[in-house]
Amino acid sequence: MPGGHHLYLVPGFFGFTNLGALRYFAHVLDFLRARSRALGVRAEIHMVRTHPTASLPQRAARVLETVAETMGREGAVHVIGHSSGGLDARLAVASGVSLPSDANVERVARRVRTVITVATPHHGTPLASFFASLLGQRLLRFLSLWTVYVLRFGRLPISVVAKLGGLFARLDDHVGLNIALLDQLFGQLLADFSPTRRGAVETFFAEVSRDQALLPQLTPEGMEVFNATTRDRPGVRYGSVVTRARPPGVRSTLAAGLDPSAQATHALYQALYRLASRTPRGRVPALPPAQARRLRRAYGNLPGPGANDGIVPTRSQPWGEVIHAAQADHLDVIGHLHDPPRHTDWLTTGSGFDAEHFEALWADVAGYVFRRRRRP
């Protein structure tokens, strides 16, 4: 591919790239292909299959191996990671890195021109500490199946919604989290899949249960160690997409309407938002002036310590140049948003992020990669 480009899309924590038709980057892939054609750019886009919850070095090794196996002899390489996939991208091309792989780091790194991170917890997320607990792990298993179910069928069954009730009301205090009910609902959701799909989902969760090294590494304390030992590679451009969701409250609850499914997913969002907002003030990263200006321009003010996208604190996300700052939740930005007819929302957050915002975001990413920036 003389003068062309290889783009690698790296999924985040619990990325379900190996569940057949459930494509993690489905809408991103379609948009980037169309955008590259519109710009007259030759680009090949690759999906990276990482272990959903393995350690960062293990996941980064898989990124490295995928690039080495598919980049051919020519063409610039660009690595784009969503959520913890952005950390995989950084680590895979870091200066002086040693990874559990036989792939030649320097051979790959010489071709890398760009690393872009999207809603990535560069300074950790308090949610990782919660999900690393025994209760948190059981809830995470249920929430992951919830996500897969909603993306597959469009909404939760009313029988499940009815049982959720106040399950998430005091989630942040570990009070009222009924483990038996979670397991029952997990089984009920799983039973709705076809036998073939159910087998794929069960294999996925069995793989997850064998290796959950990633969670402790995504805590604010874990990322402090990561950043101290992971150096950006000279000559590589680093850009980031930053997200901030609407803080939940009375207005957002009313906006969710009377639909039981929307109210249930909004209750979950409220609980996740509260947990993700608990970054200790001493661990809120100071932003370089250019990053701070970009966030103020996008949001009207500099997001505080509690601002987040339902999973990752907003102030944890900038790394390098801020390419785009969106009012969106954590999965909105990869196309799982509330917008008919082709998109399915993950949670009812009231972010207002729609197909137009999605296309503007990824047009900015494509512009950064191909050096064809949009006018503000």
What are the language-model segments listed below?
Residues 1-376:
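Lipid deacylating catalytic domains
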